[in-house]
């Protein structure tokens, strides 16, 4: 689990310039240095560990968690960790309706799958050169926008967001559907938009990497707990012995005989 040393080394304590702050983050601010707000890492550590446990427990219950982060500093790191633990992610651009109009998104994903099926079967080679080029361009665009959510069969139970100030549409859709939001909370962000905030720098690459790493580890730990629970439940469950029809009839006859003899 994250330590104070990790937070310091990754620059999690550096907020934004004082003129860019959101006054609602005042309770998370330790002070000011060269017109930069410094985040109170004691509070960050406490919120980090609490949120880690929340994410771990959600994962242990089999809940799905989506990663969202489209800005330049975050997109490759977020994709790396999301793919390593096989969770859905959006790292290029959030398409409106990704959550609130999920059925339409699924139709677009199906288009991507159909194009791939055409490639695998060789059917695409029967098209004209121009048609083939158009379809491959379509595939490239769909994969860029939807590649991270192509295996997502339902809306997620929770989303982890890098930079809630930038990902306004994603945050608004999640809130509309009452999907809990986990996010680092920089000094320019609104704490009221985040269910499980972690006060910290959401701009520095090392800080972003730390957040992604810890959330990924929480999810993996949760999955391990779920597997242990399943194994434990199986070990403690008694094997059910089913009575055959013949045995059932024989037993009923014996009971009937005992009742008759008792009546005499």
UniProtKB/Swiss-Prot annotation:
GO terms for cellular component: cytosolic small ribosomal subunit. CDD domains: RPS2 (cd01425). GO terms for biological process: translation. It holds the Pfam family Ribosomal_S2. The keyword Ribonucleoprotein applies. The keyword Repeat does not apply. Keywords: Ribonucleoprotein, Ribosomal protein. One of its GO terms (molecular function) is structural constituent of ribosome. Belongs to the universal ribosomal protein uS2 family. PANTHER family: 30S RIBOSOMAL PROTEIN S2 PROKARYOTIC AND ORGANELLAR, SMALL RIBOSOMAL SUBUNIT PROTEIN US2M. This is Small ribosomal subunit protein uS2. The lineage of its organism: Bacteria, Pseudomonadati, Campylobacterota, Epsilonproteobacteria, Campylobacterales.
